[in-house]
A protein has these predicted regions:
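Acidic, polar low-complexity linker/tail segments
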Residues: 22-47, 53-62, 154, 182
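Von Willebrand factor
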Residues: 40-107, 116-163, 190-203, 207, ...
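DG-centered beta-turn motif at the end of beta-strands
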Residues: 51-52, 144, 156-170, 216
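VWA/integrin I-like adhesion module and closely mimicked acidic/polar interface patches used
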Residues: 81, 167-214
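Short beta-strand-loop
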Residues: 84-123, 200-213
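Von Willebrand factor A/integrin I-like adhesion domains
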Residues: 193-251
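C-terminal "exit" segments of structured domains
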Residues: 225-285
Length: 285
């Protein structure tokens, strides 16, 4: 799809999103019951959870971050923002690796126009890059869930946007962790990064997109946007963020993970770690 075709597709999605938001938004969603009356009303509270495990090499880390930075300053993002019921979103950005290794790069910020979007993009861009051991998607999801508790915002929707290039291999099992997040009324979307060809003895896997679909994502409108080519990295990240702000999902629809039997073992990451290291450091519950 060319750039013009992509813009046309996104514009169509945003038009549909405006109608959907007007029809489906309620003044007091259930998850807002415990929020302070002084909290600011926004269309979505969005947590961006970014994998920085050692399997993420610099050629993956840089476009991963750049994709979010460019998305926040794009005209498609601004259009999605304007179409919302409140024309505002709240966003925070953190990096994750092992079970207890999470670092907030940018705390909760309000985006309500180009100026605040630029400020957020600049804040993310200014953070130094880092890498760390292990891949605990479950640890990242658990941490992300807690961030909503004191965000200071009333979101009509709450979304975790998790990106990574491997399966869970540390901390609690990912499925019960995911289900715990979904019970709280939070949607999980995925950005599986599939740039490397899997080789024996590595932690890379061929069907990471299927793993994300069946074991990681869930909730109303949950979807994945796989990245298989470096040239598509920024475009895919931008499209995903625009869809999340608009409250829509791409076609064909991905059925939320909780409503279908997994097509892949959701403990494959733990199994791969055990095969490689003989169970050393395998601390999942």
């Amino acid at each position: 799809m060319g750039r013009r075709g992509l813009y046309s597709a996104i514009a169509s999605v945003l038009t549909a999103a405006a109608c959907a938001l007007a029809a489906s938004a309620t003044p007091n969603p259930p998850h807002l019951a415990d929020k302070s009356p002084s909290a600011i009303a926004v269309d979505v509270e969005l947590v961006i959870a970014v994998d920085v495990s050692y399997s993420m090499d610099p050629d993956e880390q840089a476009p991963q971050r750049e994709g979010y930075i460019m998305a926040l300053t794009s005209r498609e993002f601004m259009q999605a923002l304007r179409e919302g019921a409140n024309s505002k979103i709240a966003i925070t950005y953190f990096e994750w690796a092992g079970q207890f290794d999470q670092k907030i790069i940018m705390p909760w910020r309000l985006i309500e126009g180009p100026e605040s979007a630029d400020a957020v993009a600049n804040e993310i861009a200014a953070a130094p890059y880092r890498r760390a051991s292990r891949t605990s998607i479950s640890g990242g999801l658990t941490f992300a869930k807690t961030l909503f508790d004191h965000s200071g915002y009333h979101g009509l929707r709450r979304v975790i946007d998790v990106s990574g290039d491997g399966a869970n291999n540390a901390g609690p099992l990912v499925v019960p962790t995911r289900d715990d997040v979904l019970v709280a009324g939070i949607t999980i979307n995925g950005l599986p990064i599939m740039l490397k060809r899997p080789y024996p003895g590595t932690m890379d896997m061929e069907n990471l997109d299927v793993y994300y679909e069946d074991c990681v994502i869930g909730g109303p409108g949950a979807f994945v946007v796989p990245i298989r080519e470096r040239a598509k990295f920024i475009e895919a990240t931008r499209t995903k963020l625009v869809l999340e702000v608009a409250g829509r999902q791409p076609e064909p629809r991905v059925i939320p993970a909780s409503s279908q039997a997994p097509r892949i073992s959701c403990t494959i990451g733990e199994k791969m770690w055990q095969d490689r290291w003989g169970g050393r450091g395998l601390d999942f519950q």
